[in-house]
Amino acid sequence: MVKSMQQIAMTQQKTLDQVRTFMARTYSWMAAGLALTAGVAYLTAQNEGLAMQVASLRLPLMLAQLALVFVLSMFAQRLSAAVAGALFVGYAALTGLTFSALLFAYSPAAVITAFAVSAGTFGLMSVAGFVIKKDLSAMGRFFLFAVLGLVVAMLVNLFVGSSALSLGISMIGVFLFAGLTAYDTQMLRNLALSGISGEQAERASINGALALYLDFINIFLFLLNIGNSRD
């Protein structure tokens, strides 16, 4: 009986260690991606000639970003960890290039404030998603359709040009991606609890980092827009 309880305790501890390792690897990839994006954006903005060239190539760069996200998402199980990592790094760098325009459009104070609030919001919701007992998996379809609805509203506003609609979209966007942060974190935790390991775990941590990275980036962009709307 005692031996059986010890074995159970050892198994539980091993599982907890696997979860910690997996989540730490995921957050490390995400943090590295954000750092790379920030660094590339800053360095690009410091070079006026490069910044102007990037601005002229904005559409091709955005299409390249979409292509990388598509490949990482759709072929996650076929890519090696090395290739997935390289694609993630490439995506973060491309995002940095396109984000360099933000440093011209917004004041340093606005960017720093939005980043700080984004970090706080992301951190709280990620912790909530990790520790909450309620199963959030059923929310997946809701989040999918909510994001699609948000994209449609943003496309409509490109033609309408309503500042009120833009503010409303941004406020909904912050809440939506805050919720997605909790959802994605719980899905990653559950994946780690399933006993995933080796190359498969490495690939999953990179794709998980991409999901969390996108959650953070969207929260940041919507908060920037909210701050700009109130100025």
UniProtKB/Swiss-Prot annotation:
- Which GO MF terms are attached to this record? calcium channel activity
Query: Which species expresses this protein natively?
Result: Deinococcus radiodurans (strain ATCC 13939 / DSM 20539 / JCM 16871 / CCUG 27074 / LMG 4051 / NBRC 15346 / NCIMB 9279 / VKM B-1422 / R1)
Write one Pfam family the protein is assigned to. Answer: Bax1-I
Recite the UniProt keywords alphabetically.
Cell membrane, Membrane, Transmembrane, Transmembrane helix
Family annotation (PANTHER family): BAX INHIBITOR-RELATED, PROTEIN LIFEGUARD 4
Task: Name a GO CC annotation attached to this entry.
Answer: plasma membrane
| Matching InterPro entries | Bax_inhibitor_1-related
Q: What is the topology of this protein in the membrane according to its UniProt annotation?
A: Multi-pass membrane protein
Q: Which residues cross the membrane?
A: 26-46, 56-76, 84-104, 112-132, 142-162, 163-183, 206-226
Family, similarity comment: Belongs to the BI1 family.
User: What is the designated name of this protein?
Assistant: Uncharacterized protein DR_0893
GO BP of this protein:
regulation of proteolysis
According to its UniProt record, where is this protein located? Cell membrane
Where does the protein principally reside? Answer: membrane
Q: Domain of life of the organism in this record?
A: Bacteria
